[in-house]
Curated annotation (Swiss-Prot):
Interacts with CRY2, but not with CRY1 (in vitro). Belongs to the HesB/IscA family. It comes from the Eukaryota. SUPFAM superfamilies: HesB-like domain (SSF89360). This is Iron-sulfur cluster assembly 1 homolog, mitochondrial. The gene is Isca1. Pfam families: Fe-S_biosyn (PF01521). Residues 1-12 form a transit peptide. GO terms for cellular component: mitochondrion. Gene3D superfamilies: HesB-like domain (2.60.300.12). It comes from Mus musculus.
């Protein structure tokens, strides 16, 4: 089962052009480092679970949760010692996506650079494919 939500803003971004890849999800070094930092304080959890939820003005929004186990239908991505699980409902939506972690003076958030997104809302929190 999944546990509490990860305390970070999740933003969908479609402006960046990515090279096609067969990987369901790739992580930037910044995302890997942040996930390691988050999990360091949660030794009972094995990784993060990424999902999509129906919400927002554009239809879909990403969700991130700590997880203690891999679900039967989850796809597992292991990169640089970090485990990220993708819920079945999100697998096709995330195909070829790069997960990044960005910090500036005003905010810090995970950013999904997703080549499949056809549009986002003004704030970038929700999207459609």
């Amino acid at each position: 089962m999944s546990a509490s939500l990860v305390r970070a803003t999740v933003r969908a971004v479609s402006k960046r052009k990515l090279q096609p890849t067969r990987a369901a999800l790739t992580l930037t070094p910044s995302a890997v480092n942040k996930i390691k930092q988050l999990l360091k304080d949660k030794p009972e959890h094995v990784g993060l679970k990424v999902g999509v939820r129906t919400r927002g003005c554009n239809g879909l929004s990403y969700s991130l949760e700590y997880t203690k186990t891999k679900g039967d239908s989850d796809e597992e991505v292991i990169q640089d010692g970090v485990r990220v699980f993708i819920e079945k409902k999100a697998q096709l939506t995330l195909l070829g996506t790069e997960m990044d972690y960005v910090e500036d003076k005003l905010s810090s958030e995970f950013v999904f650079n997703n080549p499949n997104i056809k549009g986002t809302c003004g704030c970038g929190e929700s999207f459609h494919v």
